[in-house]
Amino acid sequence: MAEPRTTRTSKSSSSTSKSASASKSASAAKASSSKSKSKSSKSDESKVHKLALKGSSKIVNEFFEYSINTILFQRGVYPAEDFTAVKKYGLTMMVTADDQVKAYIKKIMSQLKEWMYGGKITKLVVVITSKETGEHVERWQFDVQIFGKNSKTKSSKATTDQENSVPESSEVPEEKTEAEIQAEIQSVFRQITASVTFLPMLDGNCTFNVLVYADADSDVPLEWGDSDAKEIKNGEKVQLRSFSSSNHRVDTLVSYRLGD
């Protein structure tokens, strides 16, 4: 079961016999050679898979980093002057220039990279909370599916808790070009940007937290701790676009509190 985490601040007597022995030896050598080739082939396939998984994980990791920055900018959690423009995905993206926020996001991304490469992440959540009331007013959820994970590892625990369920997929993904993946990511960011048209304005000062749903057997640094799901009470939910790479699929969902 995946758990939400957040930062805290393995010798023959005859010629006939000799001939038979030689034949057997040649056969064994053949088998050994065949087995060796088979092992080598499997090893090569494993290396290719690991490289593909690493590359796919990097794509998802970068997407998360820019998602956090985009949400903070678009939702006005910090002043616009605290952000700077950069080019990414063929778009102009806004990233924080505030040293404290940059350090916080960097710490999150450093650990997230390790968990992503290990295939331990099932969900990343950005929660916006009112400083005055402590109420969670907006929740951005990114569900991560790892293709083929379900067929390789089965969860030892079953759960009926939708929030903690592990999204898995045994589908074989279509091969996509880098341009196709980028186009899908562009669509997600355009939707996040356009969400200001239907999301209520955030009243007063707000802060944010990042929750990472990692497998229960994940190594957790001391500065990270268990967290509740920080759900929006009686909130509205809107499903946004998704994107997929060679090994991952990421779905986006935003929940928000309706104005009084």
Where are these predicted regions, by residue range?
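Long protein-protein interaction modules used by eukaryotic assembly/scaffold proteins
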Residues: 2-96, 100-102, 115-260
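Eukaryotic beta-rich interaction modules
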Residues: 103-110
